[in-house]
Amino acid sequence: MQEEIGTTAGAIWQILNAKGELSLPSLKQQVGAKSPIFDWAIGWLAREDKVILTRHQRSYRVRLNDAQARTAGA
């Protein structure tokens, strides 16, 4: 299970790196992972300060932490 969470976290990071900020439902659809794996992967990335979640109306938006985005471009 940990490997699946890590793989999903990697997919999330790659999509956000390529597309920028997305709504949580849109990101989940693009990743194609099911709950709770997707939720655990987002939590892992947030805990590691890799992503930032912001409240937007009735949902959340997620983006890479600016430091992470700079690292990707280096």
Locate each region found by the language model:
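Short, cationic-aromatic polyanion-contact patches
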Residues: 2-9, 23, 55-74
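Hydrophobic residues on short alpha-helical segments
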Residues: 9-16
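Residue-level detection of the helix-turn-helix DNA-binding "recognition helix"
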Residues: 17, 43, 47
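Short acidic, hydrophobic short linear motifs in intrinsically disordered regions
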Residues: 18-30
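Catalytic cores of transferase enzymes with a strong primary signal for eukaryotic protein kinases
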Residues: 28, 41, 50
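Short amphipathic alpha-helical interaction segments
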Residues: 33-44
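A short, conserved structural fragment
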Residues: 46-56
